[in-house]
Amino acid sequence: MAWWRSMIDRITRRSNERDLDREIRAHLEMEAEEQIEGGQAPAEAPYAARRAFGNVTLIQEVTREMWGWNSAERLWQDLRYAGRTLRKNPVFAATAIATLALGIGANTAIFSLLNAVMLQSLPVRDPAQLVLFGEGSWEGANAGPAEPGILWLDSYPLYQRLRAQNQLFEDIAAQQNNTSGVNVEWASRPSDGTADFASGRCVSANYFDVLGVPAFRGRAFHPDDDAAGANPVVVLSYGYWQRRFGANPALVNETVMLNGAPYTVVGITPPGFTGTKIGHATDLWVPLRMQPRFMRKESFLADGRLWWLSVIGRLKPCVPLAQAQASVNVTLQQFLSEIPPASSQELVDRRAVRIELLPGARGFSGVRRLFAMPLALLMAGVGVLLMIACVNVCHLLLARATRRHREFSLRMALGASRARLLRQLLTEGLMLSALGGAAGVLIAWWLAQGLVRLADYRGAAVTVVVTPDARVIALTALVALAATVLFGLAPAWQSSGIQLATALKESARGITGGFRRRFSRMLLVFQVTLSVALLVGAGLLVRSLENLKNMNKGFDEEHVLLVEISSRSIGLAPEPTLALYDELISRVTALPGVRFAGLSRTSLLSGNTSTSDIVLPGDMPARGEDMEVQVDWVTPAYFDAVGIPLARGRRFLPADGADSPKGAIVNEAMARRFFKTADVVGRRFRNDPSSKDLEIVGVVKDAKVVGLREEVRPIVYVPVRQSPQLLSSLSVRATGDPGSLASQVRKTILDIRPRVPVGQVATLRARVEQSLGQERLIAELSSAFGLVALLLVSVGLYGALSQQVAQRSNEIGVRMALGASRGGVQWMVLREALMLVLAGIALGIPLAIAAGRLVTGLLFGLKPADPITLVAASAAVLAVATLAAYVPARRASSVHPMTALRYE
């Protein structure tokens, strides 16, 4: 195995090192012989030979530089040396690594969420070729042409026309924009009488083919599945298949019941695919032709005016987006010209309508628009936190460099150059960053999972995958490298530039102390400045959240239970369902502890709404005038149940049925907007151009029914008995704790209709808290970042002052020997610390105000220069800094003059 040992020697340079040592010894021996021949004593000859030969270490380094693999070998040497030095000082290493792990982990966690929501492409084939036909209706409601005339959604006839006249796309697919709640049961297995609530969509048969998503089990849809008279089939998502059916492979080709109707499971999607709506996981898909059966509504397939589909296409290679958009809009105008206009104004408006093609690699997402600003704000916050952490580690390295002064001096005396020393110190910093980054990834994974659970989108959980990908790993590496530069470069440069002659003196610990103290003070001011800005921002967001919680919402949130039910799965038309509603309200009202119970189509603070354009008698709306109002269908006791006060007129009565005069209740915003007066009882209007007149029988106070940040819009409430609709929200007002009624109400619903899917059951107060999920998430995270920043500032100030006190012990001893009191010494140290803190506060307040202007849209009832927040943040920093400075100040006053003077 001699060849193997030879190979190892070549790689590890053992033979080169042995040859170099032999050659240097030979030169030294020859030089010693020459010294003896010249008259030098034999005992002194070796020393004279070394002096004549020169610096052996330097010659070895120069020789090694001429060998190959030098950089890699030196890096390995530096890494081993860095590891040894960190092991010798575990407290320093643990503190620095933990500090960096917090900063890097927070950055990675927030970026993981940002990446999943804003940057990550769909898990499909070649996502860059996908194109969205409009961005979809991100509000969650069906929408036609939107301002300024851009079509968000498509009708089924328009989709068919676009696909038939397509020449520039490989194919075009469509999907139901909003998910439908579905009751799912396995037909061949016995049911326990409860319903599982799933989210489903109708999609075109080519949906999975256009996306390039193969089936994990079974198959995707075939064109025959979307033909008239086809057998009902369904494709399940991998996650739902696992969650609901235990990943049972026998489910494929079995029958499941969706809302009581049989469907054959033909396939399972691959892991990770949950649809093209980012943040909203779809559990199952059915062909578009199944829409009436699936949604339990009239057919949407023939109405060219009904906009309910979001469309996605795959461009052919090398086709420009602009060319495809021009072609699509020609088809759109041809299609619109064939639909008779409802008015001359509509005919004019149609000419401005267009479809805007958008890159589809990242899919549709209302979550993206909603969370763009908060995520950017949080990224800025964790960036500031990382800078504060780096300043702290920089303080630690400066203090450590002082203790290693003589070590650096000896290494330079032995021939190490400044560049060599600088590289060694940066390698130590890089090792700290790498270890901090590795620990930060673990923190990031845990924190990111928690962020997803806390995130809320209009009352529904956000479903995104935050598993680290190449982009997240690259960001972590980049942050770790940037941290190395931020905290390691200045101490390394300053430590490697010591003066060799003076540094070797015993009193050398004061050398370069003036520069180090000035630099340390600058870092402290910078750290306090950033901390004040972060705390002010957190304070503004927390106070804004409290303002939202305490605002006048227009309804009474106490003692109210909200229950979501899926009326579509009942299997009845709206008219027969009225009897079911009467029975439900009667039985729930009879429960002990219930005062009122009411049903509505739209749940409070759900973010959903139905709209209509009203017509005032004898009036023609001015061109471009907005006549849109929100519409809700309710039962008589609804307003008592949710606590919306009556301002004028009367509430709905049980007698307001199909045979009584058509009536409506409006809110004050509608009275002001359309009638210019509060006294509108008895006035009439039409809910749409084709309906009969409605008489206003009452006016209720304005209420934030859609969202707490939403402006109150005109609302029309219609009695469900006069205009039968499927209602989906039950509101129950209790005499005590509404949460205690949840199980009784659920049981009552299931007793009446055993297989009605009961969705979310929550108190109205909890719904209010849930609707503020985004604001709460930002406020809580910002507060956490602010507290961590405050902790880091206190640790940094304590460490820097302790180091300065240790360096100035001689000076302090002289002062005390000359008559300075202990209190005077304490005040001297405290005064210097407080001056630095006050300077940081003075710089931090303008920075905080300037940064606050960038996030004014996230504030509610506050201005960026809110004096209470500014004073509170400044006082918190000042108080913490005073406590952190007190211990070093007290230690300084305990220095004994004789102990300090002994070193002079």
Predicted feature residues:
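Structured, solvent-exposed hinge/loop segments at the ends of secondary-structure elements
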Residues: W3, E33, P46-A52, V56-V62, ...
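Negatively charged linear elements and acidic catalytic determinants
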Residues: M1-A98, R314, S343-V348, E356, ...
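Conserved positions within well-ordered secondary-structure segments
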Residues: F515-E904
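Membrane-helix entry/capping segments
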Residues: A49-F92, V124, L151, S180-G181, ...
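Small-residue-rich transmembrane alpha-helices
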Residues: E356, C394, L430-A503, L540-R543, ...
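Alpha-helical transmembrane segments of integral membrane proteins
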Residues: V62-A94, G363-V367, L396-R423, T427, ...
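Short, strongly hydrophobic transmembrane alpha-helices
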Residues: V91-V117, S121, I388-V391, S433-A438, ...
